[in-house]
From Swiss-Prot:
InterPro entries: AceGlu_kinase-like_sf, AcgluKinase_fam, ArgB, Asp/Glu/Uridylate_kinase, NAGK-C. Keywords: Amino-acid biosynthesis, Arginine biosynthesis, ATP-binding, Cytoplasm, Kinase, Nucleotide-binding, Transferase. This is Acetylglutamate kinase. Its EC number is 2.7.2.8. Pfam families: AA_kinase. One of its GO terms (cellular component) is cytoplasm. It is found in: Cytoplasm. GO terms for molecular function: acetylglutamate kinase activity; ATP binding. Substrate binds at residues 89-90, 111, 217. It catalyses: N-acetyl-L-glutamate + ATP = N-acetyl-L-glutamyl 5-phosphate + ADP. Pathway: Amino-acid biosynthesis; L-arginine biosynthesis; N(2)-acetyl-L-ornithine from L-glutamate: step 2/4.
């Protein structure tokens, strides 16, 4: 099914135009009514669809933001939308690694992971972070189930490697071994569809199994993107610690075409942790039929603001546009 593009620049703003005078000058009534009226076309369009939400950053570490996120996820489910949450946990991993005086090296936003680091990653993501998120959603009235990629072979991974040129004077490429770092290879969609139909909200930690029963640390953005394509999700939403994607002058780009996103990666405007996020969004939009959003998780109830209001808050990546 091809979704109609109800984008921020596409919606007829006159359809929901209201004035404060209509509410006797009461700004609170005006704002509440305006927000609710703007949300209707989005709710109608996306009822029954799957949203993949990558959860991380400040929205995880701040108690009030975490609670507002959990309430938003439950509300999506109540509106007939099927949210699937994929979480990171880099800050908590760093905290535990510091306790054993171990530092991490990152390449293009991915953590090089040796055997010792992998044990910490699995313990923190699957045993601590995942269960905390699950409990928050359940406390908000949802039916969340915590999983990792290993459970029921939910996500199978394969080892990821990078090549690089050690000397610019020749074209000899060397392979950079990232350790136990993988990328999604296969998704057990049957399990996820069953959970959606059973009114459960999956909460997934990005620790996965691969060949020879090896365990891999997989970037949560990549997992979210793979799930979005496998589940034919209407939307991929990535929460970050920034306002969204910005241009070279630091200005927020509210709607971003695939070609523009690729240019930002190629010219270095997008860097470090934003690289896998944009790469994931581009891949999802190219191969799927929905849109991808990069939004500021520091804003309370940012999911609702981005998804159900005309202007939104962050950056939406689409297959056509600016």
């Amino acid at each position: 099914m091809k979704l109609r593009n109800v984008s921020k620049n596409n919606l007829n703003k006159e359809d929901t135009k209201l004035s404060i005078e209509q509410f006797g000058g009461n700004v609170e009534w005006f704002n509440i009514t305006k927000t609710l009226s703007e949300s209707l076309p989005y709710i109608q369009q996306f009822s029954g669809e799957t949203f993949i939400i990558k959860y991380g950053g400040a929205a995880m570490t701040d108690k009030k933001l975490a609670e507002s996120f959990a309430h938003d996820v439950v509300l999506l489910k109540q509106l007939g939308i099927n949210p699937i949450v994929v979480h990171g946990g880099g800050n908590k991993i760093n905290e535990f690694l510091e306790k054993i005086n171990k530092k991490s090296t990152f390449i293009n936003g991915l953590r090089i992971t040796d055997a010792e680091t992998l044990e910490i990653v699995e313990m923190v993501l699957c045993g601590l972070v995942n269960k905390n998120i699950t409990q928050l959603i359940n406390n908000a009235g949802g039916n969340a189930i915590g999983l990792c990629g290993k459970d029921a072979n939910l996500i199978e991974a394969k080892k990821i490697c990078y090549t690089y040129k050690e000397n610019q004077s020749n074209n000899v490429e060397k392979i950079l071994d990232m350790g136990f770092v993988g990328e999604p290879h296969d998704i057990n969609t049957d399990l996820l569809f069953f959970m959606e139909e059973s009114d459960f909200i999956p909460v997934i930690a990005p620790v996965c199994s691969g060949e020879n029963n090896l365990t891999y640390n997989v970037n949560a953005d990549l997992v979210a993107g793979a799930l979005a394509n496998a589940m034919a999700a209407a939307k991929l939403i990535i929460l970050t610690n920034v306002s969204g994607v910005t241009d070279s002058n630091g200005n927020l780009i509210s709607e971003l075409s695939v070609s523009h996103a690729e240019n930002l990666i190629d010219n270095g405007t997008a860097h470090t942790g934003m690289i896998p996020k944009l790469q994931t969004c581009v891949k999802v939009v190219k191969e799927g039929y929905g849109s991808a959003h990069i939004i500021d998780g520091r804003i309370p109830h940012v999911l609702l603001l981005e998804l159900f209001t005309i202007h939104g808050t962050g950056t939406m990546v689409v297959n056509s546009g600016v």
